[in-house]
Amino acid sequence: MKVLVRAMSLTVIGLCVCLILMHLLDYNVRLDELNKASHLAMANTQIVMQENIEDIYYNTNNSRMKIGSNEEYLKLFKDNFMILVNSDGTYSISGYSDVYKGLLCVIISHEYKNFLGQDKTITKKIINVIDVVRDNG
């Protein structure tokens, strides 16, 4: 009887440890995906914005796409971000952008259900400012 009780208690402890590890791994995988996607989307968005600023400064027409308003600037980030993520759940992206200063401040919230059915949220805030193009001549 003692052996059976010990075996059952070890089984329950093992299951609890497995559940805790699964919860931690699920959170870390989602956080890692959110970090990588947000930083890559920010870099891609800022490259396009830098091209726009250089077009204005050097009076050229070399940028991939024109960004004319703050809403377009934020929408470009959202599009770049949504292409990069592939986990389930919902993403809400809000923020502030300024086309003339090259400023982009974004708050990303990722809401998902973990393996136990609980609602979880991960939130990340990113701020980026483009350096001003200067004439060295």
Regions found by a protein language model. Give the residues of each.
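N-terminal signal-anchor/signal peptide hydrophobic helix marking the start
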Residues: 1-13
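Generic detection of short hydrophobic beta-strand segments and adjacent strand-loop junctions
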Residues: 122-132
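Stable alpha-helical structural segments in soluble proteins, enriched in small hydrophobic residues
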Residues: 37-45
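Juxtamembrane interface helices immediately C-terminal to a transmembrane segment
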Residues: 22-38
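Beta-sandwich strand segments
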Residues: 116-122
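C-terminal juxtamembrane segment of a hydrophobic transmembrane alpha-helix
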Residues: 11-27
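Short amphipathic secondary-structure patches
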Residues: 25, 29, 44-116, 130-136
